[in-house]
Amino acid sequence: MRVKDPEIGSPAKKSMSAVTDIEVVDSHTVKIKLNTSFADFPLLLTDYRLRMIPSGSGDTIGQTGIGTGPFIVDKFDAEGTTILKANPDYWEGAPGLAEVHVIAIPDGEARVQALLTGQIDMNRYVPFAQKKIFDGNSKFNTTVVPTGNWRGMVMRTDTAPFDNPKVRKAVRMAVDRQELVDLVMGGAATVSCDTPVSPSDQYRLNMNCDQDINGAKKLLAEAGYPNGIEMTIHVSTKEPTWPTIAEVMQQQLAKAGIKADIQMTPSKSYWKETWMKKAVAMTRWNERPADSILHEAYHSGAKWNESFYKSTSFDKNLADARGELDFDKRKKAYQNAQKTLWEEAGTMIPYHVSKLVVTSSRVKNLDEVEVFSVRWHKVKVD
């Protein structure tokens, strides 16, 4: 199974660790064997990164595709323009578009300008602060899509002073999440108390986490920092809202004696040279089922454990949750994991975003859902 190959380094490897064997029963059936009880395993298989593909195609399928979708790869250029041509034999019917061009534009501001000038017809990552640019303009349509995606700030728990859980919690307590929702997202987001679990997920733990400056100062003093701490937040425009989030947090943290400097870094190299490299950096994740996101972002052995958080009791909690067949007990276990994150986590998650999608008014029949669920064969352009 390719996803479990350590040389591949898939972030979904930890989530699929329970799978021991996959047996082909017939042309439409497979039998999956697990080494433990896993009540929600069918949910895991809905992950957008898990696919059944032809044997031996793993190294090339990302560039070539296999021709079963509504569009076929004609030209692949990860740093330029990838061209997709309509698949006339698509099982749900021929697409309404002859071609789709996917243009790589790493910088958020540049993407907005490309939309305004007509270089592109759709931008699914427009900051809400720029919504007014498109509202009332007959050349564009705007759509707000609620999601479980989140933006935040990650502190490496293996690096001082963030190796002290009291310091990490103090930083998180000093943040006014509702103010971030209002100022950064224009109200179009759902407050999170540092849980990565989507607001719509059945295991979501809803908590109150109002800003607590006195509590933050108290924790810093207990940790040996009565005069506060200094930190540098590494930011880029890879995610257009990151600079604004950092600027708002800078003012909020100062109230608790936390001096935060902001350092801009190149967007193009952010994931390779900043994220999981610097002591404090901005982060973003797409929605996943509760079990997947808790394993991928926080389990001790996870490749994308961005805060380097390690806790044997937390790992055991997740294992117990997976194997619990009683729904109420399973829910309690997943929620206990989220309570632990509120106390100990290195990642500050202020909110889950509603996504602002802006398209040219020429684009028709675009589903108001996340990109992975769009029925692309129905989309047309006048």
Give each language-model segment a name:
Residues 166, 255, 259-269, 295-361, ...:
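Extracytoplasmic/peripheral linker and loop segments enriched in polar/acidic and small residues
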Residues 201, 221-287, 327, 355:
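Ligand/substrate-recognition segments at binding pockets and active sites
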Residues 357-382:
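Long beta-strand-rich cores associated with HINT superfamily self-processing modules
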Residues 2, 59, 87-133, 250, ...:
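Ligand-site clamp/hinge motif
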Residues 1, 27-33, 69-70, 97-99, ...:
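Alpha-helical secondary-structure segments
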Residues 11-54:
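Surface-exposed binding/hinge segments that line
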Residues 190-222, 239-242:
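Structural transition elements
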Residues 27-28, 45-95, 99, 109, ...:
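Gly/Pro-rich hinge or "lid" segments in bacterial periplasmic/extracellular proteins
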